[in-house]
């Protein structure tokens, strides 16, 4: 049974406007025409986003592999979030770029369904791995002993990936290679019922954006309260320890030292919380316009159909995949410092090993110079008595 055609949008949810990015027209009148100037700008921006996403996340994975603290829980979540961002770059940004260049999907039906499926897998994975990282930081602040005792991070990450793979299955049934005009085929979304686009876009918006943002807001609200409560208690404890040091001497100084050490540990945790909070903030800023435009386009029949608004929202959403590496660099700069040091060390070792002839010649020249200097000094020492 043929359903209602929606649209062949370049990324996973672009079902509502009726036109692909950079195109104008409607579905019933045949294939749309493209705004070439707008498409060229989009291709240039997507090339930059793809390069930054691939290079940035690859550097993060390489830095995490070479660091001495690779078994840290935070680094474990960072690794999988970088993998999810790479999935977004390869299976969302890259197909979008190719689709903008060719304007049509040139490939078999299986490839069409696979690409659309992996697009949503990356989006689900990046969202829920970020949510998992935030929950881990919440446990580390609110219940530190429990978070150390129950090391279920690997199981949680595995369950998250499996859940994302399952939740993305509808894409395989919605998208297929369809004839959109006489002799013109494209990777197209088809719904059995007219209300299908509304239901599907609303479900994706709830699952990927609204529900995670609510949970993230609750997590960081609780984290903020616990940090404020902790700092308040430490301020009171520090004041009491300072008074005790005046009265009890050494015992008071020991108590003050204990308070100072606890404050250092708390600052380390707060720093990781700040990092995850900035990542969450970047996620909200990048994805809010996209989901707003999507919901507006499917629920309001009078919504504007211009492609420029959808392209800006899509580009901003794609930008999220290359933001996270810079945030990691800002808060964990030692990772990249170690990576640069290892790179320079390996480069110097390679250059030193690739020029053995120059090395041996320099060694010989140094040794001959040393012998000549020894001989000249001995000659001077032997000639001194005779001159005297």
From Swiss-Prot:
Residues 64-74, 136-154, 226-274, 332-388 are cytoplasmic. It is found in: Cell membrane. The keyword Disulfide bond applies. The keyword Cell membrane applies. Glycans are attached at residues 8, 26. It holds the Pfam family 7tm_1. This is Oxytocin receptor. It comes from the Eukaryota. Gene3D superfamilies: Rhodopsin 7-helix transmembrane proteins. Receptor for oxytocin. The activity of this receptor is mediated by G proteins which activate a phosphatidylinositol-calcium second messenger system. The modification Phosphoserine is found at residues 365, 367. Residues 365-388 have a biased composition (Low complexity). Residues 1-38, 98-113, 176-202, 294-308 are extracellular. GO terms for biological process: positive regulation of blood pressure; positive regulation of cold-induced thermogenesis. Disulfide bonds join 112-187. It is a multi-pass membrane protein. Keywords: Cell membrane, Disulfide bond, G-protein coupled receptor, Glycoprotein, Membrane, Phosphoprotein, Receptor, Transducer, Transmembrane, Transmembrane helix.
